[in-house]
Amino acid sequence: MTMLRPAILLFILLTLVTGGLYPLLTTALGQWWFTDQANGSLIIQNGENRGSRLIGQNFTDARYFQGRPSATAGSPYNPMASGGSNLAGSNPELDNAIGERVAALRAANPQASRDVPVELVTASASGLDYSLTSESVAWQIPRVAAARQLTTEQVRKVVEEHTQKPLVNFIGMPVANIVELNLALDAQRKN
């Protein structure tokens, strides 16, 4: 009986600390210091939620830059089913999927002269990538420019404005947030 009382008190104390105090404290600090991130990094335009800066979207229209393929179950870019395909590099199913993606990208981007960037035909581990490297974005510029009836230079300028360079040159590559880039192109059309 002498051991039971301290055990119950410790259980109650740890439940209050780890189940109540700690979550409340981290939520409060997150809301205070990182308000945008704690609320999903949402992109709000004209009072309307257009998406998140951190989750890709399934852009299929020729006017939009397309992100990496999504391997999420059910529907592309489903945030409730985040995860990769888990197909081995030697799996014929993966080989066929990549072949189909290359053929579809070549058909949709006949102006592209270089090989299709690997990033555009392979899904990421999360299946929800929101950004692409400059190489993959540049490969799509002729298609997007033609579909929007803009010059490649006009589109390239918007791409450069939305390209994030790495903090240190030898760590990482320049990337563009595809959701923000496509929204910027839409906004340019309205102006």
From Swiss-Prot:
It holds the Pfam family KdpC. Keywords: ATP-binding, Cell inner membrane, Cell membrane, Ion transport, Membrane, Nucleotide-binding, Potassium, Potassium transport, Transmembrane, Transmembrane helix, Transport. One of its GO terms (cellular component) is plasma membrane. It is a single-pass membrane protein. It is found in: Cell inner membrane. The chain crosses the membrane at residues 6-26. One of its GO terms (molecular function) is ATP binding. It comes from the Bacteria. The system is composed of three essential subunits: KdpA, KdpB and KdpC. Belongs to the KdpC family. PANTHER family: POTASSIUM-TRANSPORTING ATPASE C CHAIN, POTASSIUM-TRANSPORTING ATPASE KDPC SUBUNIT. Part of the high-affinity ATP-driven potassium transport (or Kdp) system, which catalyzes the hydrolysis of ATP coupled with the electrogenic transport of potassium into the cytoplasm. This subunit acts as a catalytic chaperone that increases the ATP-binding affinity of the ATP-hydrolyzing subunit KdpB by the formation of a transient KdpB/KdpC/ATP ternary complex. This is Potassium-transporting ATPase KdpC subunit. It comes from Enterobacter sp. (strain 638).
